[in-house]
Amino acid sequence: AEVFPERNSYDPKNPGWAWMSNNSIAAEVGTNYEDYVDLIADNGEPGFIWLDVARKYGRLADAPDNKDYRVMGFNPCAEQPLESYELCTLVEVHLNRHDDREDFLRTLKFAYLYGKTVTLMPTHWQITNGIMQRNRRIGTSLTGIASFADTKGMPALRDWMDSGYNKIRGYDKKYSEWLCVRESIRVTTVKPSGSVSLLSGATPGVHWGPGGAFYLRAIRFGNTDPMLYLLKTAGYKVEADLVSANTSVVYFPVASEHLRSEKDVSLFEKIGLAATAQKYWSDNGVSVTLSFDKETEKKHVAPALHLYEGELKAVSFLPMGNQTFPQQPYSNITREEYNSYVGKIGKIDWSAIYDGVENLESLGEAYCSTDACEIKFY
């Protein structure tokens, strides 16, 4: 509460229960969204999930198939409708890393095969195994969608999405028979993809970039992560996390090449792009957080929800303003600050993770039969 006093719903007596903790309402088409606008404008919550749409439809471009009538909820980021005890199987393709559509379609083959292969692995829970074997649900995701639309146009985006989806469905029919397993109930998704998209310079998932030609991206690492040791040694700015005692925050300098930032795009265009992805690409869901100017766009929140409630399976919001927060994910910097920071960063010897660094150990979880596992890199 001392670190984030603006969290007006924080209750010291019940620290685990408050807004700002990824809350959503199970809504239905026709919900009175006006009742929630003030809460959304305050801190972005609640979000909305439409189970009726998720159970009835795959892609919104296709006729209702009712295949997902057993769906009981979503994963935390709401890109995957799931049955109780069902797991996510996600893989991602970066739109901005392809020369043409044929190159993109070829990438989808290998992404699909990876996702399908993971569904062949058993888990420790028999009830989960039964559901996974019946559904074979995978989520082949796209990232860089907003920047692709800005550079190549919406007609090209719709074409790539639609042809890509049909190509994956063709692969699934072919390889499911070859593997002697069921075809997947759903095969595509759009996950939020915040940190992963930085690796290829893509805009994250279906979102526009955070804004600014130059900015710092704050990413959290566990204090026992060997990466943290290497980043400190290389000269990256590292701070102790203000909330978690066992976590550190590393600031990465980024030079953006995106044509527009999220501040340049209206609420309606943002939700419209998410609906396009739900219509032409994703037969699971689309993870989207709609940033909006709470001074000028608050009045548009409820109309936008009424307009697109039958075209999305889930949505959340993030009010934007002039207020800044400690260790926020993105913070703008000047060109001079960027160049100064980059000039101080040394080269990282990534092989040190495997070849051995003095006192360098990593503790983490592994896929094993015990409650906790220790992983050491030599």
Predicted features along the sequence, with ranges:
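Conserved, charged catalytic cores of large soluble enzymes
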Residues: A1-Y69, G139-K167
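Short, well-ordered loop/turn elements at secondary-structure boundaries
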Residues: K13-N14, M20, G30-Y36, A41-E45, ...
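Catalytic alpha/beta core of large soluble enzyme barrels
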Residues: D38-I40, G47, L60-H124, R134, ...
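Contiguous, well-ordered alpha-helical segments that form the cores/surfaces of helical PPI scaffolds
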Residues: L90-E92, G139-T151, P192-L199
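Inter-helical turn/loop segments and adjacent helix faces that build the functional surface
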Residues: R97-E102, T123-T128, A149-W160
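Active-site-adjacent structural elements in folded domains
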Residues: T123-N135, R182-E183
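Flexible, glycine/threonine-enriched loop-and-boundary segments that flank and lead into catalytic domains
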Residues: K167-S195, G201-T203, D355-S362, Y367
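Local cysteine-cluster metal-coordination motifs and their immediate loop/turn environment
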Residues: S369-K376
